[in-house]
């Protein structure tokens, strides 16, 4: 299921280690293209045990996660840290992380909010698609209903805040210009779209998010970076990719999306998850 390693910008100093199945990897990857810096691409095959090997962790990242940026002898990991480092080093446009104190604060605020809301809502995608694949189940398996419901609950709650607050009166999540905050959030929805997680009737209740997602999808590099996810998740859904692709069950279980136990939405809803989902489908952002 992993793509072949590519080195499009061979011979340059920067090297990005990533895998296109990962939402944070895709946002960092797209950002490198957006600001047009020379870099080498190296796909890390996370379906194997490579990121579990001690030599990999000692050399690149003690957590074993990607993306990782290598700049000569210096290594930085975590997608936001990578993007901010590259933006500062190459004097990127101010819109990406803010031109002034207040703009920077707002973008930082969104990225921190995103990390424990939309990012954790990725459990809805993970436990319907990759989690099922890894454990030999068909996509959307009821075996993981609890995890799927936890992820979808947090996803819908986050969508409510995104619709009613962040996109209330502007085109992008932090203003009238695209920022890295948009890329981070956008690639969460790429996974949900690829996995058919959000029904059309739910999208209808979030028109601002739908318009924003369409706008981000039309950016020149969005398709290039997202194509692998759409193609391969489609194959999983059609049964063309199976668990035999993975050489270890912990593969792809390292991201934030696996920790669905952190999703605390259901206990305080005082209603069954399915009842909540029906309300969101009917009333949209007014409920979420």
Curated annotation (Swiss-Prot):
<dbReference type="GO" id="GO:0004364">
    <property type="term" value="F:glutathione transferase activity"/>
</dbReference>
<comment type="similarity">
    <text>Belongs to the GST superfamily.</text>
</comment>
<feature type="domain" description="GST N-terminal">
    <location>
        <begin position="12"/>
        <end position="94"/>
    </location>
</feature>
<dbReference type="InterPro" id="IPR004045">
    <property type="entry name" value="Glutathione_S-Trfase_N"/>
</dbReference>
<dbReference type="InterPro" id="IPR051369">
    <property type="entry name" value="GST_Theta"/>
</dbReference>
<dbReference type="GO" id="GO:0005737">
    <property type="term" value="C:cytoplasm"/>
</dbReference>
<dbReference type="InterPro" id="IPR036282">
    <property type="entry name" value="Glutathione-S-Trfase_C_sf"/>
</dbReference>
<dbReference type="InterPro" id="IPR004046">
    <property type="entry name" value="GST_C"/>
</dbReference>
<protein>
    <recommendedName>
        <fullName>Dichloromethane dehalogenase</fullName>
        <ecNumber>4.5.1.3</ecNumber>
    </recommendedName>
</protein>
<dbReference type="InterPro" id="IPR040079">
    <property type="entry name" value="Glutathione_S-Trfase"/>
</dbReference>
<dbReference type="GO" id="GO:0018834">
    <property type="term" value="F:dichloromethane dehalogenase activity"/>
</dbReference>
<dbReference type="GO" id="GO:0006749">
    <property type="term" value="P:glutathione metabolic process"/>
</dbReference>
<dbReference type="Pfam" id="PF00043">
    <property type="entry name" value="GST_C"/>
</dbReference>
<dbReference type="InterPro" id="IPR040077">
    <property type="entry name" value="GST_C_Theta"/>
</dbReference>
<comment type="pathway">
    <text>Xenobiotic degradation; dichloromethane degradation.</text>
</comment>
<comment type="subunit">
    <text>Homohexamer.</text>
</comment>
<dbReference type="InterPro" id="IPR036249">
    <property type="entry name" value="Thioredoxin-like_sf"/>
</dbReference>
<keyword id="KW-0456">Lyase</keyword>
<dbReference type="InterPro" id="IPR010987">
    <property type="entry name" value="Glutathione-S-Trfase_C-like"/>
</dbReference>
<dbReference type="Pfam" id="PF02798">
    <property type="entry name" value="GST_N"/>
</dbReference>
<feature type="domain" description="GST C-terminal">
    <location>
        <begin position="100"/>
        <end position="252"/>
    </location>
</feature>
<keyword id="KW-0963">Cytoplasm</keyword>
């Amino acid at each position: 299921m992993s793509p072949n390693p590519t080195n499009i910008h061979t011979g340059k100093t920067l090297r990005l280690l990533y895998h296109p199945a990962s939402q944070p990897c895709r946002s960092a990857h797209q950002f490198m293209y957006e600001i047009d810096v020379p870099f080498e691409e190296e796909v890390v095959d996370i379906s194997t045990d490579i990121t579990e090997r001690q030599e990999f962790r000692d050399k690149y990242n003690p957590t074993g996660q990607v993306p990782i940026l290598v700049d000569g002898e210096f290594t930085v990991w975590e997608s936001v840290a990578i993007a901010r480092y590259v933006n500062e080093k190459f004097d990127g446009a101010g819109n990406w992380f803010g031109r002034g104190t207040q703009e920077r604060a707002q973008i930082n605020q969104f990225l921190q909010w995103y990390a424990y809301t939309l990012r954790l809502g990725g459990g809805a995608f993970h436990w319907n698609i990759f989690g099922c694949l890894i454990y030999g189940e068909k996509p959307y398996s009821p075996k993981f209903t609890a995890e799927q419901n936890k992820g979808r609950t947090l996803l819908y709650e986050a969508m409510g805040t995104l619709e009613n607050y962040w996109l209330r009166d502007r085109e992008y999540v932090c203003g009238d210009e695209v920022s890295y905050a948009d890329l981070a959030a956008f690639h969460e929805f790429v996974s949900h779209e690829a996995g058919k997680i959000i029904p059309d009737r739910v999208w209808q209740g979030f028109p601002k998010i739908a318009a924003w997602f369409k706008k981000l999808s039309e950016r020149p590099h969005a398709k290039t970076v997202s194509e692998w996810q759409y193609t391969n998740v489609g194959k999983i859904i059609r049964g063309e990719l199976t668990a035999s692709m993975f050489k270890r069950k912990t593969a792809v279980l390292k991201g934030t999306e696996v920790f669905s136990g952190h999703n605390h939405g259901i206990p305080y809803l005082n209603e069954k998850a399915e009842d909540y989902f029906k309300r969101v489908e009917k009333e949209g952002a007014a409920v979420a």
